[in-house]
Amino acid sequence: MSKCESNIDELIVPELAGIAGTVSSRLSDFRDWRGDASADVSELETAASDLEVCGLTVTAIDFANPCARYSEVSFELGGYVVHGRLIEPSGCARRSELVPLCLMFHDIDRPVRGWHHMTRFAAMGYAVLALDDETIGSSDLQQGITSPAFVERVPWGCALAKVARNLDGMDPDRIFAWGEGLGGGVALAVSALDERGLACTALANPLPSGLETLSPRVRGSVLMGTSLMDTVSDPKGQFAVFNGLECDRRHIIYAKYAHERINAFENEVVDFFNQTFYSCSLA
């Protein structure tokens, strides 16, 4: 039986659950919400299964860091040229010949994270391969998971997973994903549709709507963060995504955050990855 953990009971005050508009009332309403898991994902399935990657190039960048190697990755997929940023540990940061690799996906209205930010993964002994695609906004996702912009990005993410497994020095059995907002939605979809499944997935305030249709397909463990003040990714819809998962899962709910980066959750993500791959934590 899969393991399910959440801090929801810590946030609900029984005496306030019947008062409309309170955190306790909202969470009582959200607790068992499963949404509408009937979205048509046939186009996503087709796109994610047709992964003929061509012309893969890995171009080294010299940042003179003795503990990390940096490269720009590109390949062709279905008429598109997909770009990514690759960082892998080296020197004293490399714990083994084959290392785990994090697939990283960014949110709407934001570009790929910088090299400096992502170097943290190398310091922990992980490689990271981040999708470097054009920035889109919420208006591009109005059709939920059937939105062309989302359907376009999911096979890019699945192709990155395929590429990652074949890179020298990467452990094909320890590929995992992390994303916020749109990136969280892409990470979840890749975990659900990737032919081998991912070792684990972390996501915060995932979007677009309709992701609960993919939840039952996710393999590997999941850590999910939800901000109750989020007006971009509906918190109630996020509960549907979490409640649809059938794998080991943990849900951390934040009452006082909106659609934003949560440093405390990033710490939880690091802890989650370390416990998954190295049996250690920050605690």
Predicted regions located by residue number:
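N-terminal targeting or regulatory segments adjacent to alpha/beta-hydrolase or S9 domains
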Residues: 1-69, 124, 282-283
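Primarily recognizes the serine-hydrolase "nucleophile elbow" in alpha/beta-hydrolase
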Residues: 158-212
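Active-site glycine-rich loops that stabilize anionic/oxyanionic intermediates
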Residues: 99, 104-110
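Cap/lid segment of the alpha/beta-hydrolase catalytic domain
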Residues: 113-155
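C-terminal catalytic histidine-bearing segment of alpha/beta-hydrolase fold enzymes
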Residues: 3-10, 240-283
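The feature captures the conserved acid-bearing segment of alpha/beta-hydrolase catalytic domains
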Residues: 207-253, 259
